[in-house]
Every structure is written in structure tokens, then in C-alpha cells.
């Protein structure tokens, strides 16, 4: 929540949040994290974040329960009830693909927030520990995006 509230004013366009929840951890927090991301982001992209022994798709399904607000009354005591804000969302279980898509779809002024792994340099899937670095992937995708724009536009990024 604190990260999203801090990032929100930095986005001059949309706030796009890429995140997942770790496997073999507190399952009750997953829909709560989904709800918070949906409330404070304009777009949410769900992905893997160290699924460990759990199925990444099941983890994403649990997070998604918080993304869709439950049915609410339209009026209470004769007064309209304001709608619950809920972001558009997508899911890409492959973390690299999720980061690539978030950056590819970002418009000028948008802020892409890649949350969860931070300083970690690996992704744990089953009993395998695979090399994975959010920062390196984001830099690589941004460099490719800049290069493509220069080639298409013939000018600077």
C-alpha cells in the first residue's frame, strides 16, 4: 500500500503495477493485495513472483479475487453509493513477458511499477532457482524500446 501511495503522484499518466505473490506464503493476503493494487493503480498486470511449489496460475487466480469488487448496493439510506474504483487488469504468468508488455503498452507520462522482487536476482519455480533480475529485464526492454523508436522515427528517443 505504501509503495503504491508513494508512486501514485509520480505518475503523470497512468500507474501500471506489475506484481505477483510468492508461493508457499500467506494465501489470505493475495486477494487483499489484489484489491489494494486495483484501488490504487490504473492498470494491474499479475505475474509470477517465486511461485515455489505452487502453481503460478493458482496464485494469480487468488490475487484476481481481490481485483474484481463484490456486488454492492447502488443506494444506501436513499443516497447513492459511490462505485469502488477498480483498475483494468491482465495476467502474464511469465514475469519477463509481464514486464515487457507493461513497458510496451506504457504511454508518455505513465509510470510502470514493477513490485515484489526488488534486489532479488533469482526466481524460484518448483525446486529450481533460476536467474532473474527485474531491473536488468526492465533496462533491456527499455533499451530495445528506445532503439526501435530511433529506427522508426529516425531521431532521438
Place the predicted regions along the sequence by residue.
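ATP-dependent carboxylate-amine ligase
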Residues: 1-157
Amino acid at each position: 500500500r505504501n509503495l503504491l501511495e508513494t508512486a501514485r503522484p509520480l505518475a503523470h499518466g497512468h500507474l501500471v503495477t506489475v506484481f505477483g505473490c510468492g508461493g508457499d506464503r500467506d494465501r489470505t493476503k493475495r486477494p487483499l493485495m489484489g484489491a489494494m493494487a486495483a484501488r490504487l493503480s490504473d492498470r494491474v498486470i499479475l505475474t509470477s513472483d517465486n511461485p515455489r511449489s505452487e502453481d503460478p496460475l493458482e496464485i494469480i487466480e487468488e490475487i484476481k479475487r481481490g481485483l474484481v469488487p463484490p456486488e454492492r448496493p447502488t443506494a444506501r439510506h436513499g443516497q447513492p453509493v459511490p462505485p469502488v474504483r477498480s483498475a483494468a487488469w491482465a495476467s502474464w504468468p511469465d514475469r519477463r513477458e509481464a514486464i515487457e508488455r507493461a513497458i510496451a503498452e506504457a504511454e508518455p507520462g505513465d509510470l510502470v511499477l514493477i513490485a515484489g522482487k526488488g534486489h532479488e536476482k533469482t526466481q524460484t519455480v518448483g525446486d529450481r532457482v533460476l536467474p532473474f533480475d527485474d531491473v536488468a529485464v526492465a533496462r533491456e526492454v527499455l533499451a530495445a524500446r528506445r532503439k526501435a523508436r530511433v529506427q522508426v522515427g529516425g531521431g532521438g528517443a
